[in-house]
Structures are given as C-alpha cells and as structure tokens.
Amino acid sequence: GEITPSCSRFPTPSGIFRDAIGLSKLIPSIFKPGIIMADWDHKESKFVDQVMGAFMFMRKSIFEKIGYFDEQFFVYYEEVDFSKRLSEIGGKSFFDAEIKAIHTREGTTSSVKAFRLFLNLQSRLKYAKKHFKSSGYWCVWFCTFFIEPLTRSVSLLFSDKKNEIPDLFKGYWLLLKNR
C-alpha cells in the first residue's frame, strides 16, 4: 500500500476558497492546501486538527461528552464536525504514524461519482452553516456554486479524466435540486 494523506486542517472560508481556485496546486511553494494536509508526508506522529473518520479511536467518555456524530452529515464532514467540537472543549486529535490501516478510498461511493460529489458539497455547506459566521458561509456558498464548477471543469478538461465531466455536472445538478 501507500500512505494517503488522511489528516486535515479545519476548513475555513479562506482555505476553501484557496482550494476552490487551485492555488495550492498552481503555486505549491507559496500556498499550502487549505484543508487536506497533502503538503505533509504523514511519516511522523503529531497533533493535527482532524484525522480521517475511517479509522479513529477515542475514549467513550469523550465521545459521549461531545455528543456523538451529528446526523446531518452523511458520509462526509461528520468527522470534521466531530473534531471541531472536540477542539472547542480543549481536546486534540493525534495522528499516530506507527498505526497502519487499509482503507479502500471511495469504496462506498466509487461507482456513484456524481452522488459522491453531491454529498461532499452538501456536507461542506452544512458544515459552513454550522461553524462559520454568515459572511463565511456565503463565501463558501459562492465558491461552491460559481468558482468550483468552473475550476473543476477546466481541471478535468486538461486531464485524463475527461470522462468524469458528466458526473461533475450531474453532481452539481443534484446539489442545485436539493438545496
């Protein structure tokens, strides 16, 4: 197997904006990724904002104190929200580089790319509404509906994934229909 970036920074409106326009991919020497910690090799253990929910351990007492996972987040952002609430009570997430786990990336949703995109974007908007001020939420909303469709389309056009363009449009159509 290979090491997959599995830790993230807490989302912020500016981080989402930077990722939406692709600054970390265009100028990685200046702009680090806004959310996914792809700029770190994950070879050493350290405290991070958030670890991927596919493989987390915690004391039951902490889980109960925070209030479990928020059910409004389905498949995506549930661990981000949980970790954010953990940090708000002074808790921390720790990434242990010695622990190995096998995770089939997109295993649940690999055959439904449009639906996966819809769920991810929908959960991100719910996270923004829950954790950001109104201006931050509307910044994320604008990025989601106006900037990202364009940058994602251009990125797919200039890649070997042109066949995913219909899924991109279908995912955004689902988001528009279900907002």
Predicted stretch roles:
Residues 2-66:
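Acidic/His-rich active-site region of diverse nucleotide-sugar glycosyltransferases
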Residues 6, 20, 65-66, 76, ...:
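Residues that scaffold the ATP/ADP-binding catalytic core of kinase and kinase-like folds
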Residues 115-123, 134-179:
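Non-catalytic, C-terminal membrane-associated alpha-helical segments of glycosyltransferases
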